[in-house]
């Protein structure tokens, strides 16, 4: 007998974020989605042109043209127009796209996509470390334009701002978050006004809108053009957030915000800086802040600092979200996940991730000291993630197309993939300048994620090899039962349909069986949310035992007591009164096998991660005073 929980399907995305109007959604997208790419003008053009010794108008116009057309091709075409189509039930991001890419695939192709997707997600952590450091530093560097005597204060003030930013994470950003949209709207308006005024003074800069300037620059300086791509890509930082945050605001709001406000403001700002450099090449020391009048510099530094805090908040929240997805999909050990809002379910806080990010960001600020030094490190993380997205999109978007439409998809995505390869290749040459940092972070996180996934898979395979069919076992056990005790025993199991080790240990040591036995398995679907009518499935195993499977999406937090309340309503014959219910869990200790399935260092790493993962009781919200843990050793 199978049962599915009753209830109307729930639109999870609407439940999480349902603003009352299109304008509210667009304003929210400005504050969350576009903070990173919106603060790129602080450092991008300076990083592009600072290495050219004798800056000429042709250099300025050529680089501006390349920058503008990359914005149009990579952001407007690739992300806003195409990649946003690859949604996993309304959700985006590397791991959501990975789940779509591997769906229905087996063998080597599936394994390669998983490896690529995990490495792309791992590189995102490098981005999450660099973005707060480079953004806040670049904003505060404006105080050296206000007064040279203030320059030594840039790093100390940046450290204070960053510590404060990470300190407030545990309290949530609900109240302050309502200001993010208006703050970024003011920021983009400021970019447009500053840039527009400079263009009005030097309208010749608009010639760079013609792609001929980009092609001419590439033809005349091919090597320089390729290497400059490593800096021009800084204008694209944050493009990945458009896709990752699709679940919060929806495709239409993100597209409207980009074309109506963000793209025009960025274009005006970059071309405004170019206009200033055409008149005064010496302004390359900080073209963004030198666009402003002296009387407005202090206010601009303050606004820029607040805008970079908003941008940093977006990537910190993104790191929390990616980690939760990785935990739910089995790529990361269980971690403590706290909700900071009773209304917004998407507002979460992971203490361990927050602490590690803070330490990493502070080290980066002290190590690199200024935004220019961090620029090389930034580009590698960004282009690596973008390349991953392109490959996964190549595996997803043409899938349901046939004939000429499929060929068109392949050609278009192939061309975009070539551009991403060029951008990534240009940043490989910057590994020695700082690109080693996100590469190192990516390799470390990738190794951790693959080790955890491999270890869990080996444990599951080991249990499957030693499996005993649950239905037959319970039928035989009830035919010759041990002593029965009152109440209900709930056995958590990884493999539904097989006898859980905790039951065998309980029978061996305690020699009793409860009046009611419920075998409970938690399943995470390859979709972000599961509707309430699909929350659980029930099968009757024997006269006094049942098998329950509770289903969650990869963006949901398991809540076993809440799910059991639904089971109790549907199955009143099972005694699930909390005070008469005991949970039996297995606690495994990894030891070396005679023929190890993992290298010694990987086995030690997996065992360390397992010991330090959040306990099952806390992760599944099970009352600890109702839990019996059965310790056992497993060989790897």
UniProtKB/Swiss-Prot annotation:
According to its UniProt record, where is this protein located? Cell inner membrane
Q: Which InterPro entries match?
A: K+_transporter, K_trans_C, K_trans_N, Kup
Is Aminoacyl-tRNA synthetase one of the keywords? Answer: no
Q: Which UniProt keywords apply?
A: Cell inner membrane, Cell membrane, Ion transport, Membrane, Potassium, Potassium transport, Symport, Transmembrane, Transmembrane helix, Transport
Q: Which reaction does it catalyse?
A: K(+)(in) + H(+)(in) = K(+)(out) + H(+)(out)
Q: Which GO terms describe its cellular component?
A: plasma membrane
Topology term for the membrane:
Multi-pass membrane protein
The protein, known as: Probable potassium transport system protein Kup
Protein source organism = Bordetella pertussis (strain Tohama I / ATCC BAA-589 / NCTC 13251)
The lineage is:
Bacteria, Pseudomonadati, Pseudomonadota, Betaproteobacteria, Burkholderiales
User: What gene name is listed for this protein?
Assistant: kup
